[in-house]
Amino acid sequence: MGAYKYVSELWRKKQSDVMRFLQRVRCWEYRQQPSIVRLVRPTRPDKARRLGYKAKQGFVVYRVRVRRGGRKRPVPKGIVYGKPTNQGVTQLKFQRSKRSVAEERAGRKLGGLRVVNSYWLNEDSTYKYYEIILVDPAHNAVRNDPRINWICNPVHKHRELRGLTSEGKKNRGLRGKGHNNHKNRPSRRATWKKNNSISLRRYR
């Protein structure tokens, strides 16, 4: 068994005494640092490698802190216009996951880099922590690598803002395949619009 197998087994048993203590200490450390921090190497090397990370030039890892809880509607003094049924301010549920929010924040802050993937790292009562894998599309080590140079194409700018990363596709309901997922393609909204708009052909 290789070393990564042991590491992944450790992370599978998060409730073990070792991992509980380690995660608690790390959480305290993360709270003292800024919300977006560059790391020297990934905290979970086995997970990072599975998601596309390589320990070579052009690849970087950032840790992002996201506040837990629901999303409050950003209205001044709670003044919402419209019908009473739509006047909620609190108890609204954001339609995307915290992980996709973390990817978005990293992508906005680091505009010259491209988001490859991300994974869960830690959480406490107030925050969730994720590590984001990014690559530099201008670096020759990335441009000359046939396994990753697809991301250098301009069409992949800000994938995380358009729901094109793994987590973004999951939030859009595009993870599944087959006849059970016909109503998710090309998107849930497009299918709804097609099914709810009347198209009457002209009689000639």
Curated annotation (Swiss-Prot):
PANTHER family: LARGE RIBOSOMAL SUBUNIT PROTEIN EL15Y-RELATED (PTHR11847:SF22), RIBOSOMAL PROTEIN L15 (PTHR11847)
Keyword ATP-binding: no
NCBIfam families: PRK04243.1
Stated name of the protein: Large ribosomal subunit protein eL15y
Bias type Basic residues, positions: 171-192
UniProt xrefs under Pfam families: Ribosomal_L15e
GO terms for MF: mRNA binding; structural constituent of ribosome
Ranges annotated as biased composition (Polar residues): 193-204
Any GO CC annotation of this UniProt entry: cytosolic large ribosomal subunit
Organism of provenance: Arabidopsis thaliana
InterPro entries linked: Rbsml_eL15_core_dom_sf, Ribosomal_eL15, Ribosomal_eL15_CS, Ribosomal_uL23/eL15/eS24_sf
Keywords: Ribonucleoprotein, Ribosomal protein
Region (Disordered) residue spans: 162-204
GO biological process terms, semicolon-separated: translation
PROSITE patterns: RIBOSOMAL_L15E (PS01194)
Family recorded in the similarity comment: Belongs to the eukaryotic ribosomal protein eL15 family.
SMART domains, sorted: Ribosomal_L15e
